[in-house]
Every structure is written in C-alpha cells, then in structure tokens.
Amino acid sequence: MKFDIVLIGGGLSSLVCGIKLQKAGKKCLMVSAGQNALHFSSGAFSLLGKLPDGTDVAEPLSAVETLPSEHPYSKIGKQRLSEYVASVPGFFSDCGVALHPVEATETIHNGYRITALGTLKPAWLAMDDVTLLASKDEKIGEKALIVNFSGFLDFNTRFIAEGLEKRGTECRIESVKLDEVELLRKNPAEMRSVNIARVMNHESSWKAFAHKVQELLNGEDVVILPEVFGFEEPVIMQWIKEMIPAKVVFIGTTPPSVPGIRTQRLLKKAFEAAGGTFLMGDEAIDAAFDGERVASIRTANLGELRIEADTFVLASDW
C-alpha cells in the first residue's frame, strides 16, 4: 500500500492536517486506535489562554509577541499565525461544526467557559452550544436552576453550584427522572453521557425532559443542563432552549464528551469525503527506515502488509 502521506492518530490535529492535505491533492491514510483527545473535549478551543507565568491572556495574538523564542508560536511567527487563525472558523464551518459567530476584526479576544467543576477557563472559540462569558466578572444570571438526571454521577451539580455562587449567582439543584434514562441505571456502566445522549436523540425523550424542567422553574432566570444532547442532531439543543422560558446553559460533563465525539465524527466524515482513507481501530506497531527517514510502517490489523508513504505525520499525543 502506497500513499503520499500517512497520519498516525485520529484526533483533532491529525484530522485537521489530513483534511487540509487531502483537499490540497495529496493521497492520505489515517491510522487511529480509536479514542482520542476529542473524546475529552470541552467543546471550546484555546489559542493562548495563559502566559508561561500563569497570567491570563485577553488578546491571544497580541500576547504572542511576549512569548519566549522557543515557543512554537514564536517560531511560526505572528503574521503566519494570524493567517491560520483567520482560516479556522471557515474550516470548521465547511466540516459541519457550528461555532459561535466570530467578528471579522484584527483583534481577537478570549472568553471564559464554565468547566465541569464550575470554574472558569480561558477559551478562544467554542461550539455554538457552549456558553462563553466575556470576562471572569460576568455573572451567568441572578438565579440558576441546575438540573441533572437522577443517578447521573458525571455531572457534578454541587461543584457547579459552588463555582457559580462564588460569582454571585444563587443556585438551586434539582434532578429529573425519565423512564428511558432509568433503564440505563440497571447497569451503572451504562449511565454515561454518550448513552444518555443517544436516548435524548429521540424527540419524545428530549421533549419530556424539557417539560419536566419547565415544571421545576420557580423564578430562575437561567437553567443549567448537562451537555448530553444533540449527539446526532445539534439542533435539538436549540429546540430545548426554545421550550424553556429562561436562559439555558449547557455545561460539559466528565468524559466522554458528547460535543467532542460529535466533532470527531464530523471531521472524520469530512476527511473521508475529501477522499482520505481512515483505518479505525488500528495502530502503528513497527517502522522501517531508509537512513533517518521512515519508509514504511506496519499496523496491528494488516499483518505483514507494509504501508509506504513519502511522509509520515505522528499525531498520536505520544
């Protein structure tokens, strides 16, 4: 088997690289063992959130000039980095990944996303179902109703409430029981975000959940829900927002990440649509060298069949 480029790894960096190369006319193969960093994604993307000394960054591109010379961004250079940054929203849009609208200005600003522990973390871009606050001082609302599924332990409502109350939002925690989700509780291993999200793909299920949230509201101006909706159809999250008479904020759970897996699937689809070959559930186990250059690799599933390429890209997080 001969390709122009073989990419080892199936996460964000490998998929972005593979899509760009495939669209540029290269013949690409991607080898992915399966789970990758997108399965742990927050649904937000960072460019430069903090300086090496821990200082928060407000304007990432402006802060690049203060980085040490050995930093990758310094080596790329601000001008080229700016060009890459400008192309990101369009790239994701072409792949079907919807982001918050970005103003076409020379200066880009970081916002803050709410983590699964209720803390704030700098972020540059976010999927359109992830809430970004303009600053650390911004309150999400005056009164928040935090709603979880009964028995779902991967959404820590207490931590979220503590974090929000420190910033001046009064919080009340409630849980909802749905027959369809209760079936998952028979096996604790099944009570995970992705499995709940699959149940919530059904119109009857997410509508029933939204109706129960409506009944729980008691003067709150914001409702906080676990990010376990829109696994197949992200528009479901918008429909839920339209049904609930308060501002609705989705906050990520502990992994696996529903928005992350959704993004990985969309990027994989875009890579294959561009003509790329994707080996899922396989891994590179051996390499043959021509001098200091990798000439071919062997994978676990292909036995003695070697894969040759002009270039190999290692994007496996190792």
Model region roles, listed by residue range:
Residues 6-8, 31, 284, 307-317:
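Short hydrophobic core segments
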Residues 9, 147-150, 226-227, 300, ...:
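Short, well-ordered coil/turn residues at beta-beta hairpins
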Residues 268, 285-306, 312:
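Conserved beta-strand-loop-beta-strand element in the redox core of flavoprotein oxidoreductases
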Residues 70-73, 131-152, 172-176, 182-195, ...:
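Helix-loop-beta segment of a Rossmann-like dinucleotide-binding subdomain
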Residues 33-69, 180-196:
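Conserved N-terminal glycine-rich FAD pyrophosphate-binding loop of Rossmann-like flavoproteins
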Residues 3-30:
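N-terminal Rossmann-like FAD-binding beta1-loop-alpha1 element of flavoenzymes
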Residues 155, 159-167, 200-218, 222, ...:
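Helical element adjacent to the flavin cofactor pocket in flavoenzyme catalytic cores
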Residues 47-133, 138, 144-145, 149-152, ...:
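Dinucleotide-binding Rossmann-like beta1-alpha1 core, especially the glycine-rich loop
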